[in-house]
């Protein structure tokens, strides 16, 4: 599900003397990138950082549904999924498809040697983009912006936006939605920059403490269960994969949620998703002749993935 607000006509998406940038060429040059990564890199090059907002979150139903909106330049698209990450993934994918398919959409890449002082004062950073870059650099989930309040008279509107980054939350207010987002992001950046070196607490440790199980902590964990997984074969018959995954989750500090899919697979088998609250979130698919078998298969696939991640250096 996606929509676009862009209407202006422009030349095709190519990097030429006019200063435009080719999204298609970038995708070809960087295979294997996720839609979120591709769109972010595109936004960085065109000075149009993608901004993600959670529009809807239905977690009280059997299969949770999340809806995220991504805005990059004049393009706005939405995506739905059973996890926040999947919803963001689909929103980014929809935006990329529009950018690739619509030759009338073209962003100009500003000349770094000729900045526009009327749009951005010298040395002033974009706090929304800076916070997103910080999250990507440290492997955190991307910041989420939610419009929580809108009020005031027509000539003096005030917007309140909540920005969430892992377990942290900041609120920003402004005369426009964009200004409210900027203020919330600025508060986060100020909070992180105020962590003094005298306290011997790094920014990564402060936020990382709230992440639970990260790939870095998994690789360096002295835990008995995760190290046993590194040495074990996952093809031994009659192994209780659900129990084994549960023991590792308890040791490493993440939760497991099994989401049964109502629709049968193409070959008539039951399907299930195992969602691990690691950082980033891990979702693995499983199938079988029963719901229980599908869950066991999903747990098996999750264990295989954790084993690969834990063994990497």
Swiss-Prot record:
Under Pfam families, the record lists: dsrm (PF00035)
Q: Which GO terms describe its biological process?
A: antiviral innate immune response; cellular response to oxidative stress; immune response; middle ear morphogenesis; miRNA processing; negative regulation of cell population proliferation; outer ear morphogenesis; positive regulation of intrinsic apoptotic signaling pathway
Task: Describe the effect of residue 265 to A.
Answer: Abrogates apoptosis induction under conditions of stress
User: Is Acetylation among the key words of this record?
Assistant: no
Effect of changing residue 287 to D: reported as: Induces activation of EIF2AK2 and apoptosis in unstressed cells
Q: Which residues carry this modification: Phosphoserine?
A: 18, 167, 246, 287
Record keyword Repeat present: yes
| Domain remark from Swiss-Prot or TrEMBL | Self-association may occur via interactions between DRBM domains as follows: DRBM 1/DRBM 1, DRBM 1/DRBM 2, DRBM 2/DRBM 2 or DRBM 3/DRBM3.
Its name, as the record gives it, is Interferon-inducible double-stranded RNA-dependent protein kinase activator A
Per the UniProt entry, what species is this protein from, by scientific name?
Homo sapiens
């Amino acid at each position: 599900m996606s929509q676009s607000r862009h209407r202006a006509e422009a030349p095709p998406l190519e990097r030429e003397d006019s200063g435009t940038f080719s999204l298609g060429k970038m995708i070809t040059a960087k295979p294997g990138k996720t839609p979120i990564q591709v769109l972010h890199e595109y936004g960085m090059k065109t000075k149009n950082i993608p901004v993600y907002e959670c529009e809807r979150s239905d977690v009280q139903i059997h299969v949770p549904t999340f809806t995220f909106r991504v805005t990059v330049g004049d393009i706005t698209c939405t995506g739905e999924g059973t996890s926040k990450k999947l919803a963001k993934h689909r929103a980014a994918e929809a935006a990329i498809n529009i950018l690739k398919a619509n030759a009338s959409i073209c962003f100009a890449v500003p000349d770094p040697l000729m900045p526009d002082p009327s749009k951005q004062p010298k040395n002033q950073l974009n706090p929304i983009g800076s916070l997103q870059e910080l999250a990507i650099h440290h492997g955190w989930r991307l910041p989420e912006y939610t419009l929580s309040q809108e009020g005031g008279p027509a000539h003096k509107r005030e917007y309140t936006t909540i920005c969430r980054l892992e377990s942290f939350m900041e609120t920003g207010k402004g005369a426009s939605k964009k200004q409210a987002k900027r203020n919330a992001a600025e508060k986060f950046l100020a909070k992180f920059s105020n962590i003094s070196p005298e306290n011997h607490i790094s920014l990564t440790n402060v936020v990382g403490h709230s992440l639970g199980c990260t790939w870095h902590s998994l690789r360096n964990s002295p835990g008995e269960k995760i190290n046993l997984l590194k040495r074990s074969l996952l093809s031994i018959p009659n192994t209780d994969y659900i129990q084994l995954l549960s023991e590792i989750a308890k040791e490493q500090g993440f939760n497991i949620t099994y989401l049964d899919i109502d629709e049968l697979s193409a070959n008539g088998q039951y399907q299930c998703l195992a969602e691990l609250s690691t950082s980033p979130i891990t979702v693995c698919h499983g199938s079988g002749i029963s719901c229980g078998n599908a869950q066991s298969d999903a747990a098996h696939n999750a264990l295989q993935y954790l084993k690969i991640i834990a063994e990497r250096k």
